Amino acid sequence: VIHATDGHAEWTASRQPQVVILGHFDGIHAGHVKVIERGLKYGREHGLPVALMTFHPHPKAVFGDERYARCLTPPKEKERVLAQLGIDRLYIIDFNLSFAQLQARKFADCLCNLGVKHAVVGFDNRFGHRGEGSAELLAEWGEGCFTVDIVSAHNDDDAKVSSTRIRQCLAEGEITKANQLLARPYLLRGTVIHGDARGRTIGFPTANVDPDEPYVIPRNGVYAVKVKVGGMWHDGVMNIGLKPTFKSGETRPSIEAHLFDFDADIYGEEVTIAVMDFLRAEQKFDGIAALVAQITADAEEARRRLASMEGAPALESVFQG
């Protein structure tokens, strides 16, 4: 991983003939994978290492849209997924107001100075000051230095697969659709912290998870999940929310997962949560008995839905690793 803090000076330190795949790639969804696979294929055929160049923080966050302070794949998560896909090198450009002033033609020159022989971009890729650079202009400016492969849109139900659509799905609890667009389950990683231990007193001990990075958090509600602890995956049910039965005035949602047939002490451990399906919205109950009855029903429904997903091809690569 190479971090460039001023936009381009550090790039030349790693100058060598290479393929570079360009884009933000938040989520690394099915459309992104199509672009990445084109770059990997070219690299294999021509004996060249394949790099991916991305930006952090999200450009929209830099320009004031706080929704984009959270990512579908924050930096470490993105690094993990790209390594699994076979990317040899990752350039993370520190996107700031200074870099945003970089002229598009200058950016193309930087790629040439980096030793790029072939660039792969999505059809709608924009770069440079005010997004003045396009895939077509990159191909024109790269003549004599590098070739450019422009990858067409990847559609699902006649609409382009996009990070924006996935964010919207997560905000609405449309987890099945989000996972379909991602071509894998949506993942959250975090550390198990001490909570109020109320779950254990009512027969449903939970792991309170503090996310390790600024992930986009799905809407408040109850979910069927798989949780990876110490290299093993466990089925479970998760609640994201404000726990209105017990608290009022809370504004920061908590993430609590109850793992089925599991009773180990995992405080302080890092866990990975694969969000598999949305069960219901969060609700306030009149008392403990009503809450316990609903959690029992949620657990049964989560078991049923998770059992129906066993062996699904899109899930196998995640749960075998």
Predicted regions and their residues:
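Short acidic-hydrophobic, aromatic-tinged amphipathic segments that line or gate anion-handling sites
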Residues: 1-10, 70, 91
